[in-house]
Amino acid sequence: MIKSTGALLLFAALSAGQAIASDVAFRGNLLDRPCHVSGDSLNKHVVFKTRASRDFWYPPGRSPTESFVIRLENCHATAVGKIVTLTFKGTEEAALPGHLKVTGVNAGRLGIALLDTDGSSLLKPGTSHNKGQGEKVTGNSLELPFGAYVVATPEALRTKSVVPGDYEATATFELTYR
């Protein structure tokens, strides 16, 4: 059916003596995805333990660190030996450079610090993990351990203005292989 319809259309165009031109667009996307992000690392939720707002009124004005891991798995053999860097991206809190901005009743009063894979260095949004060096893929999987904590802004500490209520922040991460 398709062949005969095509032949009929071709015949009609030739017999009318007109040429018809039309564009055909082709698109594609090539990815170099040597490792897959594990399902438990996609759309990850880091939940901070409930704390009294007054815990953020006095120095150091921060929560304990919550640990989390980004897991890479099913790394293709061509990935072994490559360096993978992970970069978190998100809106920074103006009063706490290098910290994520929170939304909710304490916006502008709290920020979220991300800790690098060494467990102590601040990992600023837009910078790559492991002090920019990344991590070498050495096998089929790789675990990247991070931490996060909530901290009051200097102004919120000074004025004791952190109040009870929910807060949240969102960051995305990007993986680059080289």
Curated annotation (Swiss-Prot):
Family matches, as InterPro entries: Adhesion_dom_fimbrial, Adhesion_dom_fimbrial_sf, Adhesion_dom_sf, Bact_Fimbrial_Adh_Pro
UniProt keyword annotations, A-Z: Fimbrium, Secreted, Signal
Gene Ontology CC terms: extracellular region; pilus
The organism's place on the tree of life at top rank: Bacteria
Record's subcellular location: Secreted; Fimbrium
Keyword hit for Secreted: yes
GO biological process: cell adhesion involved in single-species biofilm formation
Signal sequence residues: 1-21
Note: Strains of E.coli that cause infection of the human urinary tract produce pap-pili which are hair-like appendages consisting of about 1000 helically arranged subunits of the protein PapA. These pili mediate binding to digalactoside-containing glycolipids present on the epithelial cells which line the urinary tract.
Free-text function comment from the UniProt entry: Adapter that links the pilus rod to the base of the tip fibrillum. Regulates the length of the tip fibrillum and joins it to the pilus rod. Pili are polar filaments radiating from the surface of the bacterium to a length of 0.5-1.5 micrometers and numbering 100-300 per cell, and enable bacteria to colonize the epithelium of specific host organs.
PANTHER family (UniProt xref): FIMBRIAL SUBUNIT (PTHR33420:SF26), FIMBRIAL SUBUNIT ELFA-RELATED (PTHR33420)
Protein name: Fimbrial adapter PapK
Gene: papK
